Amino acid sequence: MKEKLKELQELALSKIEAVKTSSELEEIRVKFLGKKGELTTILRGMGNLSPEERPIVGKLVNEAKAAVEEKLESVLKAIKDKEKAEKLAGETIDISLPGRKKVIGKRHPLDLTLQSMEEIFVSMGFTIEDGPEVEYDHYNFEALNIPKDHPARSEQDTLYINDNIVLRTQTSPIQVRTMENQKPPIKMISPGKVYRSDSVDATHSPIFYQMEGLVIDKGVTFADLKGTLELFAKKMFGDKVQTKFRPHHFPFTEPSAEMDATCFVCGGEGCRVCKGSGWIELLGCGMVHPNVLRNCGLDPEVYSGFAFGFGVDRMVMLKYGIDDIRLLYESDMRFLNQF
């Protein structure tokens, strides 16, 4: 048995020495040390030996295994080092070649439009206010004169965290918080993301951007609202743009209106974008409802104000002639590189 083990060990070592690849080395390992390997088989047959022979043979087998394993590790390391060196040699970089130019990013059309809108209002004396996107029901609905049974509160329109907390459906809660924390005069805008329970299609998204504005002071009138928004439209879309106001209803303003502007595509002549009317709806607006003022601790007999709100995504689509809102969120560089 001793001679047989010595022969097996020498055979294994000689075969290991002759291999060229790691796959050949693995075959040898399996042949001698695998579950059915020759050295493993001898170990399993130890039960057939006499009590005197077992410790002697066991020691010899373990010594042979240790020698083979050590050789396997040594040769495997040499093979891997050689393969690594060959790979590195094949990947040699010519350092004299010109480098790649850095790709310079561009501003997203949403960001460009939002910045333009903010700059216009800041130039008119407005401040920019911010607030939480996860909002209390009180700020999103109650304080804005939206009663419990109002359709906007349904789960079809609003994303609820629990009974008292929602993902804000508008940036109007920022106006409420501002009126609670600042004394008039107030002149502010509140841009940011809002959330609705909408399915994604060409004109709807569950997440989009809104900008709302608020002016509160003594003696503020609807004429101030019209003058402010008409000036904004001309600065945003050019001096030739015309505007008109239509009566509408919002629970947080009274009276309420929607402002239209002459179509940016056809100049008011009528086209596919404006559906032949020559006009495009831009925003909703109105005088702040007395109940909203009271909810914020302001006396409607002393103070008045106006509010307005834009869908920023819609403004982007109108400004650049984009007919699918999904393009703004798909990160398609072919689309974004146009701006």
From Swiss-Prot:
Superkingdom, natural source: Bacteria
Names of required cofactors: Mg(2+)
Subunit structure: Tetramer of two alpha and two beta subunits.
Listed Pfam families: Phe_tRNA-synt_N, tRNA-synt_2d
GO cellular component term of the entry, any: cytoplasm
Phylogenetic placement of the source organism: Bacteria, Bacillati, Bacillota, Clostridia, Eubacteriales
GO BP: phenylalanyl-tRNA aminoacylation
Subcellular location: Cytoplasm
Cofactor binding mode and count: Binds 2 magnesium ions per tetramer.
Gene name tied to this protein: pheS
Keyword set, alphabetical order: Aminoacyl-tRNA synthetase, ATP-binding, Cytoplasm, Ligase, Magnesium, Metal-binding, Nucleotide-binding, Protein biosynthesis
Family: Belongs to the class-II aminoacyl-tRNA synthetase family. Phe-tRNA synthetase alpha subunit type 1 subfamily.
Protein name: Phenylalanine--tRNA ligase alpha subunit
Reaction equations catalysed: tRNA(Phe) + L-phenylalanine + ATP = L-phenylalanyl-tRNA(Phe) + AMP + diphosphate + H(+)
EC class: ligase
SUPFAM superfamilies per UniProt: Class II aaRS and biotin synthetases, tRNA-binding arm
Annotated residues for binding of Mg(2+): E254
InterPro entries in the record: aa-tRNA-synth_II, aa-tRNA-synth_II/BPL/LPL, Phe-tRNA-synth_IIc_asu, Phe-tRNA_ligase_II_N, Phe_tRNA_ligase_alpha1_bac, Phenylalanyl-tRNA_Synthase, tRNA-bd_arm
Gene3D superfamilies xrefs: Bira Bifunctional Protein, Domain 2 (3.30.930.10)
GO molecular function terms noted in the UniProt entry: ATP binding; catalytic activity, acting on a protein; magnesium ion binding; phenylalanine-tRNA ligase activity; transferase activity; tRNA binding
Major place of residence: cytoplasm
Documented EC number(s): 6.1.1.20
